[in-house]
């Protein structure tokens, strides 16, 4: 009996040992198959990205650069510049996140490489209402099986994000940035423009305070920023290549961008962020606003561009949504109204030139889109928009005027907003405005 039991026990041990060996073989085969299909796991990439955010927060340059291929000197230099620039910026949040599943794997030695879209998710302390993002394409490689993963290439994404890609940001564009902060403004400029940032920061601060006070006095509901991010550039080339890659020379003296909030696709719908999380202003110093003969010029353009930035946060439709395009006469007229310090629109510096245009055959009109390629037409269009907002404020009051602006930014058409807020049709408003303007400038 004892012999039988011993034989059975021995058989069980042998069977278990055989099964264990077979399981090891199956596990190894499964692991090999998984590695062949997925040689660089998303968990590894996420851990690498988390480490980048940690290194930036701790100002650990060595750790930040450790993930990049040391053989690629240009890449290491690029990322060294980026790290040192980012370290100067007051971020409330700054993390790197993987977007999507990445490209197909490509063989590399005994390993593989893959491309991933990486979002630099950030929130400027005191200036952004919600986190925003800038997107890059990273090439991540493992040159040999079992070896570490390294980043071998990084490039900014400039396509598929509408008119403005939000790349390159100042920290990408310039080797050395200067950051100048006031209570309500944050200048991020090329270090070569440090003196100009320091010179104009007080004027921008006064412009921000004036605009915020005007909006507050209007009593319109809605979350707006209490600070504004500004970059100064010299010339149209830089104006058209910061936060965007302009195909043509930009005609404007300054631009304000509403920056989309970073949207976590895994978040519940009731936790989705508003469409616009912040704004960025870029102003060209090589324009008449900054000539010695125009002492009020800097304040005028700061108030104008910050007016756009202030109400951008109210946006409640996608930027590329063409169902309710914004009427330029209203948005630019509002910016001109605040830019002119809410003074009578007839005091506008554009008025003398407009009178000449009208006497030479141009006509009054409220244009939904300005012809920026025709300077005389554009000047008249800005002036007409300004006069319309001035008329609206004079007849209906600033609060109603600001409500019209807010509702239009929230996605309502002008033809619907005017009856709703002012109890007047667009056609009747236009007729009354035109009659009013002709009487004022005759």
Region spans (language model):
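A short hydrophobic beta-strand element
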Residues: 108-123
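Acidic/His/Gly-enriched intrinsically disordered linker/tail segments
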Residues: 297-301, 306, 316-398, 402-442
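Short beta-strand edge/turn micro-motifs at domain boundaries
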Residues: 23, 122-176
């Amino acid at each position: 009996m004892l012999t039988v039991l011993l034989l059975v026990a021995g058989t069980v041990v042998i069977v278990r040992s055989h099964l264990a060996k077979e399981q090891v073989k199956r596990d190894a085969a499964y692991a090999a198959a998984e590695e062949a299909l997925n040689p660089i796991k998303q968990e590894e990439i996420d851990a690498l990205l988390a480490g980048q955010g940690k290194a930036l927060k701790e100002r650990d340059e060595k750790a930040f650069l450790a993930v990049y291929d040391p053989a690629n000197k240009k890449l290491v230099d690029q990322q060294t510049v980026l790290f040192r620039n980012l370290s100067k910026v007051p971020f409330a949040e700054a993390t790197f996140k993987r977007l999507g599943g990445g490209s197909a794997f490509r063989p590399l030695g005994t390993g593989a490489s893959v491309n991933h879209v990486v979002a630099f998710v950030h929130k400027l302390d005191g200036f952004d209402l919600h986190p925003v993002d800038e997107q890059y394409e990273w090439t991540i490689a493992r040159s040999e099986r079992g070896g570490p993963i390294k980043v071998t290439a990084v490039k900014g994404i400039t396509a598929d994000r509408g008119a403005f890609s939000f790349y390159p940001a100042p920290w990408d564009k310039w080797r050395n940035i200067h950051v100048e902060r006031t209570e309500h403004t944050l200048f991020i400029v090329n270090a070569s423009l440090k003196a100009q940032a320091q010179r104009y920061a007080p004027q921008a601060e006064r412009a921000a305070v004036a605009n915020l006070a005007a909006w507050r006095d209007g009593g319109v509901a809605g979350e707006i920023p209490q600070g504004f991010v500004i970059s100064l550039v010299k010339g149209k080339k830089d104006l058209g290549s910061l936060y965007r890659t302009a195909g043509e020379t930009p005609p404007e003296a300054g631009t304000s961008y509403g920056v989309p909030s970073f949207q976590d696709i895994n978040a519940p719908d009731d936790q989705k962020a508003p469409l616009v999380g912040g704004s960025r202003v870029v102003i060209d110093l090589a324009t008449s606003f900054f000539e010695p003969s125009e002492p009020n010029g800097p304040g005028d353009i700061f108030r104008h561009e910050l007016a756009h930035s202030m109400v951008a946060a109210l946006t409640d439709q996608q930027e590329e949504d063409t169902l309710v395009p914004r009427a330029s006469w209203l948005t630019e007229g509002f910016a001109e109204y605040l830019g002119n310090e809410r003074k009578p629109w007839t005091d506008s510096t554009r008025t003398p030139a407009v009178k000449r245009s009208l006497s030479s055959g141009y006509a009054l009109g409220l244009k939904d889109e300005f012809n920026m390629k025709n300077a005389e037409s554009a000047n008249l269009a800005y002036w007409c928009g300004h006069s319309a907002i001035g008329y609206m404020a004079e007849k209906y009051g600033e609060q109603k005027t600001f409500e019209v602006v807010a509702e239009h930014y929230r996605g309502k058409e002008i033809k619907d907003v005017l009856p709703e807020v002012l109890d007047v049709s667009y056609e009747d408003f236009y007729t009354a405005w035109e009659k009013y303007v002709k009487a004022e400038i005759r």
